[in-house]
Structures are given as structure tokens and as C-alpha cells.
Curated annotation (Swiss-Prot):
Any one GO BP annotation for this protein: translation
Record key words, sorted: Ribonucleoprotein, Ribosomal protein, RNA-binding, rRNA-binding, tRNA-binding
Oligomeric form and interacting partners: Part of the 50S ribosomal subunit; part of the 5S rRNA/L5/L18/L25 subcomplex. Contacts the 5S rRNA and the P site tRNA. Forms a bridge to the 30S subunit in the 70S ribosome.
Protein name (record): Large ribosomal subunit protein uL5
Organism: Solidesulfovibrio magneticus (strain ATCC 700980 / DSM 13731 / RS-1) (Desulfovibrio magneticus)
InterPro entries xrefs: Ribosomal_uL5, Ribosomal_uL5_bac-type, Ribosomal_uL5_C, Ribosomal_uL5_CS, Ribosomal_uL5_dom_sf, Ribosomal_uL5_N
Gene3D superfamilies: 3.30.1440.10
């Protein structure tokens, strides 16, 4: 059991049960999975960039990243169906807990002028999406070897039914929201 998972079981779940008055332990919101997505618009012209992104996202996530391809051709973007446009990885169970622990305790505090994560990334159903502008905030990335600074989207999917429940879940786990 990972550190963050233990915090969830011992502190977060009982607090959520008390706060929202759940009668069953299965009603308590929990994390389903975390999805990391790196969209690379210029990847259609540069194959080296997509390979670099896959290697870096694999290092960050601890799991092999998959190349995402264009579903439709768009002439204005010089994009053909099947061209690589980014990469993504979905984390579940222990890898998810390890990644979230690393994100909240190591990566986010390394962001320049970090004052907290804005809470406007909730989708209305308790899931939270966060944009990261520089992937170099993660400890696995060697800043000297980075050729292109890339951003990524981190989506945390929960079983919560409302934003209030999802926010409290992430807040109790240690997500540094803006005050």
C-alpha cells in the first residue's frame, strides 16, 4: 500500500464519510484513474519530437506512453488522418497513487511562482483536470537534455458525483488548491 493510499484509507475516507453522511463505504468517493496527455501540434512535421515526448512521458509516469493519432484530416493544420499528434498514458492502482504523490509533493512546488492549483478545473462530476506548462518540473526529467519544453494535461478521475465531493477528496489528499 502506497503512502498516499494509506492516508486515504486512514484519514480521508472516514472524514468524507462523516462530512457527507454516507451510509455505505462504497459511497465514499475514491480515485479511479489518472490520465496524462501530451498534445504536440508540431509533431506531424517532426518525428523526433514525438519519440522524445513518448520517452519523457514514460519516464514521468513509470508506464509506457501510447502515441495518439489524428482521427480526421484537417487541411488548415496540414494534418492527415493517422498522423501522430501526441501521446498519452492512463495510470491505475499503485502507479496512480505514486504519480499523484510525486505530483503534489515534488513537481507542483517546483513550478515558478507557485501559489496553488486553481480549482476551476472541475468538470461538474467530481473529476479534475490540471494543465502543466513545463514537463521539466518532474524529477525524472533532466533539464539539460530537454530540447523542447512540452506541456501536459493531467486528468484525475474520481467516483465522486459532484465537484464539492471531488474537491474535498483531493484537498484532504493534499492537492495544493489556491486559497
Amino acid at each position: 500500500m502506497t503512502r498516499l493510499e494509506q492516508i486515504y484509507a486512514e484519514k480521508v475516507a472516514p472524514e468524507l464519510k462523516k462530512e457527507f453522511g454516507y451510509t455505505s463505504s462504497m459511497q465514499i468517493p475514491r480515485l479511479s484513474f489518472v490520465s496524462l496527455n501530451m498534445g504536440l501540434g508540431e509533431a506531424s512535421n517532426n518525428n523526433k519530437l514525438i519519440e522524445e515526448a513518448v520517452v519523457e512521458l514514460t519516464a514521468i509516469a513509470g508506464q509506457k506512453a501510447v502515441i495518439t493519432r489524428a482521427r480526421k484530416s484537417i487541411a488548415a493544420f496540414k494534418l492527415r488522418e493517422g498522423m501522430p499528434v501526441g501521446c498519452r498514458v492512463t495510470l491505475r492502482r499503485d502507479r496512480m497513487w505514486d504519480y499523484l504523490d510525486k505530483l503534489m509533493n515534488f513537481a507542483l512546488p517546483r513550478v515558478r511562482d507557485f501559489r496553488g492549483v486553481p480549482d476551476r478545473g472541475f468538470d461538474g462530476r467530481g473529476n479534475f483536470t490540471l494543465g502543466i506548462r513545463e514537463h521539466s518540473i518532474f524529477p525524472e526529467i533532466n533539464v539539460d537534455r530537454v530540447e523542447h519544453v512540452k506541456g501536459m494535461n493531467v486528468t484525475i478521475v474520481t467516483t465522486a458525483t459532484a465537484d464539492k465531493e471531488g474537491k474535498m477528496l483531493l484537498d484532504l489528499l493534499g492537492m495544493p488548491f489556491k486559497k
